[in-house]
């Protein structure tokens, strides 16, 4: 896990994915040619931005499951966990975007769920410990490693998800 004010992971991811870099057609002037005005991580979108939303919903559902199992809750006011959620993401220009999400077939012990985002289905499983920043798991049979941080900004319930150099 790389932490700090910022990191160069998005830049490295963009560099390694650039077609000229992939084919080996680069030289010492490559960065000056392609990033003369600087680099902005927002210019390199995630291959599947809905995966980030699905992972956020999956992790939120896991936190809600833990909260619902805490003993000593006030009778009649226990934490109830549904399947429908709205994930609010912050666009690169600061605007909020909302996504309707369904998290079903939740299995807390196995750490798996089916997540629907915008008509796409994601079968996510992970046994990562809540509060752990590095989360490993699988999505639709493919392994992933992501950074998941809870309590970012002024919202203690907010999640920051970073995967493959984007968030």
PLM feature spans:
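Short, solvent-exposed coil/turn linker segments
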Residues: 18, 27, 123-125, 135, ...
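A generic structural signal for well-ordered coil/turn residues at beta-strand boundaries
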Residues: 82-84, 131, 155, 164
């Amino acid at each position: 896990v790389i932490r700090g004010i910022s990191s160069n992971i998005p830049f490295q991811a963009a560099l390694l994915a650039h077609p000229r870099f992939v084919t080996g057609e680069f030289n010492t002037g490559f960065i000056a040619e392609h990033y003369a005005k600087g680099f902005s991580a927002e210019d390199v979108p995630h291959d599947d931005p809905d995966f980030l939303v699905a992972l956020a919903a999956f992790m939120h559902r896991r936190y809600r499951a833990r909260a619902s199992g805490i003993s000593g809750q006030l009778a009649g006011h226990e934490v109830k966990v549904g399947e429908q959620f709205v994930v609010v993401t912050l666009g690169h220009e600061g605007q909020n975007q909302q996504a309707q999400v369904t998290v079903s077939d939740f299995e807390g012990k196995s750490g798996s769920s089916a997540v629907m985002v915008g008509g796409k289905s994601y079968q996510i499983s992970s046994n990562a410990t809540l509060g752990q920043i590095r989360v490993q798991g699988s999505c639709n049979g493919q392994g992933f490693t992501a950074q998941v941080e809870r309590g970012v900004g002024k919202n203690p319930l907010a999640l920051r998800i970073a995967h493959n150099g984007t968030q």
